[in-house]
Amino acid sequence: RWELEKAMEVYAANDCTVISDEIWSDLIMPGYTHIPTQSVSRDARERTVAFYAPTKTFSLAGLIGSYHIIYNDRLRCRVQRQGNLSGYNDCNVLSMHALTGAYSDEGMAWLDQLCAVLDRNLRYIRDFLQSRYPGVTMMLPQGTYMLFVNCGAWCRSHGITPDDLRRRGVEHG
């Protein structure tokens, strides 16, 4: 929360409009809570355009189901005016049912199970990498299933650069 509060102070001091990608906000690992950008202050609520979508979390890519939350009337009008130009943002019947199902009690129960499985898998990957590749470190994510692996110490101990490691991964898999 404090990171968002500090960032919003900088944005307020510079009169910035904030676009907040909250699309991963449903995919939170056990023991953590998502903090929406707009919730940290009244100013954050007024200057932030927040985008959400069930597509990544519920594997609904390809369906039109993203949405935004904009409290500021001026910003909302600007976003809607631009969004309406493409004609692509009109929700269809399939998308409406998918969105409703995703956020139903059954969908939330499925999501809880998914997050528990992802958490176990992420811990397995961390333990595997650290046991087989001394010097490789990573932090478990609080949300999403994306990993950022630090191979710097492992590369130094093997006399290669991170670019060499990346190249080997591309060329040899």
Where do the protein language model's features map onto the residues?
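PLP-dependent class I/II
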Residues: 1-173
